[in-house]
Amino acid sequence: MFKLTSSPHIHSGKLTARIMLWVIFGMLPALAVQVYYFGFGVLIQICLAVALALILEFAVTKLRKKPSLFYISDFSVILTALILAMAIPPYAPYWVILIGTFCAVILGKHVYGGLGQNLFNPAMVGYVVLLISFPVQMTGWMPPISLLHEPPTFGDSLGLIFSGVTGDGFSLSQLVSSIDGLSSATPLDSAKTWLKSGGSATDLLNQPIFLPGLEAGLGWLQVNLAFFIGGLFLIWKKAIHWQTPVAILLSLGIFCGLFDLFGNAQAVGFFAQLFSGAMMFGAFFIATDPVTAPVTPKGKWVFGILIGLLICLIRQFGNYPDGVAFAVLLANICVPLIDQYTRPRVAGYGLNGRN
């Protein structure tokens, strides 16, 4: 006897849970590098985000009378929490990640009906809510711990996140200000502020957070390289499509080259654009979300080019130094339109004056 089931009857065998696990696995190198350069804070943020995300997923699916364990076991909510936790400053107060996780899971996902129904990337919804609502907490990045006199221990990291001070009573700002030339700003933020104030690129690169001779920051370059390697792994495993990240990086390079060509004094160099902030993170792990990205190869190219253009414009003219999250969300709005104009025509379309 054959069992009657709904389509599709032929599939690739790539279950949602398997793809999510590959993406999580691809993020592990960047996580290890981030812990090495910026301390244990990111691990604590991940634990808080994942714990709350699982609780919310369980509660909402129960309220909607759906099988909670089935939806939790696809690992999508864990991936959302992981992306959000790795995107925020490692030593942000604990309530920041809790609010962001709530917004990501509830507002970014379940308001639209759950996995597969959301218009926007859930993690970026949570991130943008935090960035707009709590700009001070969301811009307080720890410089690489190798530049500090005494790198924070795991206990110090717990203290900074839950009480705002280490075991010795030092706040994050006090730890940073103890070293001349250091600030809690990211290299992109420092470069944007410095160049807008009329400072020279040579003096900018002499700051301790920048690698000698490069506009990319210490720690940030290595984290972006790790995300790049993880992204190549995902492409190799066919967990993501290559068109979107390639389109983002190529378009960003072209538009940044145009700014350099016309001599924009406030423009950050091409190398810094690619290997600073959340560039590789966004290109390979955020913009490639299959739910919120176009479905056709041509659409993925258009989507990636749009994101690259928006990132370049926000970084050059906007108030925010990075712009990846805003670019992805703005491009998400355009996905239905992109799909409409890039999907292949059905055979026989337009024959005899009929569609």
From Swiss-Prot:
<comment type="function">
    <text>Part of a membrane-bound complex that couples electron transfer with translocation of ions across the membrane.</text>
</comment>
<dbReference type="GO" id="GO:0055085">
    <property type="term" value="P:transmembrane transport"/>
</dbReference>
<comment type="subunit">
    <text>The complex is composed of six subunits: RnfA, RnfB, RnfC, RnfD, RnfE and RnfG.</text>
</comment>
<feature type="transmembrane region" description="Helical">
    <location>
        <begin position="294"/>
        <end position="314"/>
    </location>
</feature>
<keyword id="KW-0285">Flavoprotein</keyword>
<comment type="similarity">
    <text>Belongs to the NqrB/RnfD family.</text>
</comment>
<keyword id="KW-0597">Phosphoprotein</keyword>
<feature type="transmembrane region" description="Helical">
    <location>
        <begin position="77"/>
        <end position="97"/>
    </location>
</feature>
<feature type="modified residue" description="FMN phosphoryl threonine">
    <location>
        <position position="186"/>
    </location>
</feature>
<feature type="transmembrane region" description="Helical">
    <location>
        <begin position="128"/>
        <end position="148"/>
    </location>
</feature>
<feature type="transmembrane region" description="Helical">
    <location>
        <begin position="13"/>
        <end position="33"/>
    </location>
</feature>
<keyword id="KW-1278">Translocase</keyword>
<feature type="transmembrane region" description="Helical">
    <location>
        <begin position="98"/>
        <end position="118"/>
    </location>
</feature>
<dbReference type="GO" id="GO:0005886">
    <property type="term" value="C:plasma membrane"/>
</dbReference>
<dbReference type="GO" id="GO:0022900">
    <property type="term" value="P:electron transport chain"/>
</dbReference>
<feature type="transmembrane region" description="Helical">
    <location>
        <begin position="245"/>
        <end position="265"/>
    </location>
</feature>
<keyword id="KW-1133">Transmembrane helix</keyword>
<keyword id="KW-0288">FMN</keyword>
<keyword id="KW-1003">Cell membrane</keyword>
<protein>
    <recommendedName>
        <fullName>Ion-translocating oxidoreductase complex subunit D</fullName>
        <ecNumber>7.-.-.-</ecNumber>
    </recommendedName>
</protein>
<feature type="transmembrane region" description="Helical">
    <location>
        <begin position="216"/>
        <end position="236"/>
    </location>
</feature>
<keyword id="KW-0812">Transmembrane</keyword>
<keyword id="KW-0249">Electron transport</keyword>
<dbReference type="InterPro" id="IPR004338">
    <property type="entry name" value="NqrB/RnfD"/>
</dbReference>
<dbReference type="Pfam" id="PF03116">
    <property type="entry name" value="NQR2_RnfD_RnfE"/>
</dbReference>
<dbReference type="InterPro" id="IPR011303">
    <property type="entry name" value="RnfD_bac"/>
</dbReference>
<keyword id="KW-0813">Transport</keyword>
<keyword id="KW-0472">Membrane</keyword>
<feature type="transmembrane region" description="Helical">
    <location>
        <begin position="35"/>
        <end position="55"/>
    </location>
</feature>
<feature type="transmembrane region" description="Helical">
    <location>
        <begin position="318"/>
        <end position="338"/>
    </location>
</feature>
<keyword id="KW-0997">Cell inner membrane</keyword>
<feature type="transmembrane region" description="Helical">
    <location>
        <begin position="267"/>
        <end position="287"/>
    </location>
</feature>
